[in-house]
């Protein structure tokens, strides 16, 4: 059996069951394990469901049970500067950001990794459902988690080779149900704790109310593509492409009784465009432009390749051709795609391997920009 006792692994512990089991498994495998709780958001003046104080108590309880030292580190400034400012800027620009992708890139695998190194870490570990595999040349490949429903490589797609070289994902080969079983068998304090949802580190707050604290909403006109007035919208930032609920128009104004969806935004005129039907023609596109293109291992500056891609989390893969030009790419779809949303991540896969991805700038239909922004 390998002696891991001289290998120090610093585990990012959130107070949830996944990171608790991550720490437990590493301890059982003989590693020198340290737990670290990251405080990334000041919730003292908020009425959120999730509180950092309760989570830290859970981290302390689990660390004591496992028998590992634990620390708390405050990344509120880093989170605000590197993630939250970006999040607000994207909404201001009419896009729908994915803060979890940026949070992993900038906080969990940058600020936290840097902090772990000061504790003498050889590796960091998190409770993400993903896998890392080292090839004969020492290159680390990031693979999907074995639990298809929980795979989180979409959110980890901006990680660099340097970050992956220093990362362990002990849950990657497990199903979520197995993780719960391990926690219950070990009697961990977090075994029955429900999974967190909501924005990375901000918790389950009322999103509309939360956003309005930071960005003043500007009401405006709601219209169909052909110019029919449909009433008033509450502020473009509250709507995302392809959204159905929250429009306040129900089945009215249409002869065919199909539901209404957000099909576009005009930021300069502050107009929200809506249309009837899940597959409304304005929602369909056959290519996209992306920026911040990044690969998890070394790739040429300019090249073209075929692969599969996801345009949002928990979406089946779609076949695409990718034309890479530096940190930008054109992604052409084999089949038309619905509701490609600027600000979201496009993530590339080769079978089980996550190759990387970028941020969606604009969708196109037969070379013409979709009426999104």
Curated annotation (Swiss-Prot):
Residues 98-100 are annotated as: Interaction with target base in tRNA. SUPFAM superfamilies: Adenine nucleotide alpha hydrolases-like (SSF52402). The record marks 128, 344 as: Interaction with tRNA. Residues 150-152, 312-313 are annotated as: Interaction with tRNA. It catalyses: S-sulfanyl-L-cysteinyl-[protein] + uridine(34) in tRNA + AH2 + ATP = 2-thiouridine(34) in tRNA + L-cysteinyl-[protein] + A + AMP + diphosphate + H(+). Its EC number is 2.8.1.13. One of its GO terms (cellular component) is cytoplasm. The active site is at 103 (nucleophile), 200 (cysteine persulfide intermediate). The keyword Cytoplasm applies. One of its GO terms (biological process) is tRNA wobble position uridine thiolation. The keyword tRNA-binding applies. One of its GO terms (molecular function) is ATP binding. Keywords: ATP-binding, Cytoplasm, Disulfide bond, Nucleotide-binding, RNA-binding, Transferase, tRNA processing, tRNA-binding. InterPro entries: MnmA-like, MnmA-like_C, MnmA-like_central, MnmA-like_central_sf, Rossmann-like_a/b/a_fold. Disulfide bonds join 103-200. It is found in: Cytoplasm. Belongs to the MnmA/TRMU family. Catalyzes the 2-thiolation of uridine at the wobble position (U34) of tRNA, leading to the formation of s(2)U34. This is tRNA-specific 2-thiouridylase MnmA.
């Amino acid at each position: 059996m390998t002696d891991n006792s001289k290998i120090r692994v610093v585990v990012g512990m959130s107070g949830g069951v996944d990171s608790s089991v991550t720490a437990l498994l590493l301890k059982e495998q003989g590693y020198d394990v340290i737990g670290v709780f990251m405080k990334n958001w000041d919730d003292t003046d908020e009425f959120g469901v999730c509180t950092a104080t309760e989570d830290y108590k859970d981290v302390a309880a689990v660390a004591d049970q496992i028998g590992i030292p634990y620390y708390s580190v405050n990344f509120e400034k880093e989170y605000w500067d590197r993630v939250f400012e970006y999040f607000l800027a994207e909404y201001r620009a009419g896009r729908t950001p994915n803060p979890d992708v940026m949070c992993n890139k900038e906080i969990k695998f940058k600020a936290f990794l840097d902090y772990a190194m000061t504790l003498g870490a050889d590796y960091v570990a998190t409770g993400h459902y993903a896998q890392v595999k080292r090839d004969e040349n020492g290159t680390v490949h990031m693979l999907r988690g074995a639990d298809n429903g929980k795979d989180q490589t979409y959110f980890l797609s901006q990680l660099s080779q340097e970050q992956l070289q220093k990362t362990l994902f002990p849950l990657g080969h497990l199903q979520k149900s197995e993780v719960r079983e391990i926690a219950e068998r070990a009697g961990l304090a977090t075994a029955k704790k429900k999974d967190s949802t909501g924005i990375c580190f901000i918790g389950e707050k009322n999103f509309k109310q939360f956003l309005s604290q930071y960005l003043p909403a500007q009401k405006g006109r709601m219209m169909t593509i052909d110019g029919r007035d449909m009433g008033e919208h509450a502020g473009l930032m509250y709507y995302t492409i392809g959204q159905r609920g929250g429009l306040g128009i129900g089945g009215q104004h249409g002869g065919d009784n199909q539901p209404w969806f957000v099909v576009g935004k005009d930021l300069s005129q502050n107009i929200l465009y809506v249309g009837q039907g899940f597959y409304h023609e304005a929602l369909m596109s056959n290519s996209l432009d992306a920026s911040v293109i990044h690969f998890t291992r070394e790739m040429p500056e300019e090249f073209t390749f075929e692969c599969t891609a996801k345009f949002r989390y928990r979406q089946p893969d779609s076949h695409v051709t990718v034309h890479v030009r530096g940190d930008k790419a054109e992604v052409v779809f084999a089949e038309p795609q619905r509701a490609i949303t600027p600000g979201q991540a496009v993530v590339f896969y080769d079978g089980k391997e996550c190759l990387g991805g970028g941020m969606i700038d604009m969708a196109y239909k037969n070379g013409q920009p979709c009426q999104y922004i």
